Structures are given as structure tokens and as C-alpha cells.
Amino acid sequence: MSATERPRRLYRYVIDHDKGFAPNPFFGVCTLACCKPSIRKYAETGDIVVGFGPKKYKLDGQIIYWMEVDEIIDFSTYWEDPRFRMKRPQMGGSLCLCFGDNIYHRCPDTGEWIQEESFHSDPNSLVGLGNLKRDTGRTEKVLIGREYAYWGGFALAPPERFHCLIKGGIGEQYSVDDEALKEEFIAWLKDLPDRGFVHDPADWSRDPKLKQLFQLERAKC
């Protein structure tokens, strides 16, 4: 089933940690493979996902990214697909590689989940059980979008007429009171000239630990 069989949804939520992990906007494709299990479970191709900035960085109400979902696969396919090898995390590499979101696949012998060392691991490279449960417990779906714009720390403020569509606080939302306004908002997003990875994630220049790492030449993407 695709969103063409129902009105396409406009999923909105606040990105509390904008590190380039969820979503992962690198290498020419935007992926949402971790966090936001409700969106990943129910979204269909053709739906639009919009992430707003966090209040802690004074980015609330501003758009960090948007993407149109054009492909949905499961974790195992994501892990094995050569198109997404660069999305596998490489700790110690550039920040784009450190925050790879292609981290889940099943052990062929036991069927148990393997969580690769990543942002969702616990300290000392241990499996982050809480993250594993949240990421895999409700759905195995990975959302993929090639039509997207990611502004990161240069989040974009929408025009005032769309402020009623802004999502604040925790959770996510797709319901709207005005379908015509929703479609106008989507059209506005698609008319913007920016596409793909536009600017670095907000946390890279604001989180103290990442800010220090970002200054190292080897960390640059």
C-alpha cells in the first residue's frame, strides 16, 4: 500500500538530538532507520516527514529537514544492500561516518538482533539495550527519501501562514485541520531551491563534545 491510496500524511516532530544519525542525510539519500518508531511503522511511500529544531538551541519552530518517502525496506535489507554500505557506522572516521544509521541486522545462527557499534551503543561499545528495544521493538522499517533538504544547524523558519502546522514538544503528529493548507505547505517545501545535504547538523557546532571533535580535520566530512 502507498500513500496514493489515502491522503498523503505530513509527519512532524521535534529533533532533540541533531547529530546526523536520525535522520541520516549523508551520501545523497536521507534515511530514518532509528528512533521515531511510530513514524517508521505507519509511514508509506509518498508521505512527507518534517523535523523541527529543539528549543535548547533556539531552533524551535524551524525546519531542520524534510523528505518525501520513496522507498521502505527492513533492517536486514538495509544492512545487506550495497547502496547503503556508506551508511554503516565507522567509529573513528569522519562525523558523517561515525553517525551512520545502518546498525541493525540479525545473527544468522540465532536470529537475535546485532547492534553495530554506533551512536546508539552504550559506553565502552556495549549494546544499548534501551535503544535497541525502541528501534526494533515496534517495526523493522527504514524510511528512505531521495527528494529531501537537510538544513541542520541552519534550520529554516516557515512562513507565518504555516505556523499552525509546526510540531512542538515530544511525540509526532500527522493529523491536520486543513488539508488544503497541508498541501500548500508541501508545495512550498518542494518549491524551495535547496536539496540534499545543505548544512552540518546542529549538534556539531553546539554540543560541547562534538564541537571539539568537529574542529579536528579528520572529523570533517
Would you name each region that the model predicts?
Residues 11-13, 52, 65, 78, ...:
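Aromatic side chains
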Residues 1-61:
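Short N-terminal edge-element motif at the start of the domain
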Residues 58-59, 74-77:
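Eukaryotic short linear interaction motifs
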Residues 48, 61-72:
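Short beta-strand-centered aromatic/proline hotspots
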Residues 55, 73, 154:
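Short, flexible active-site-adjacent loop segments at beta-strand->alpha-helix junctions, enriched
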Residues 1-6, 36, 76-221:
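Contiguous surface segments at macromolecular interaction interfaces
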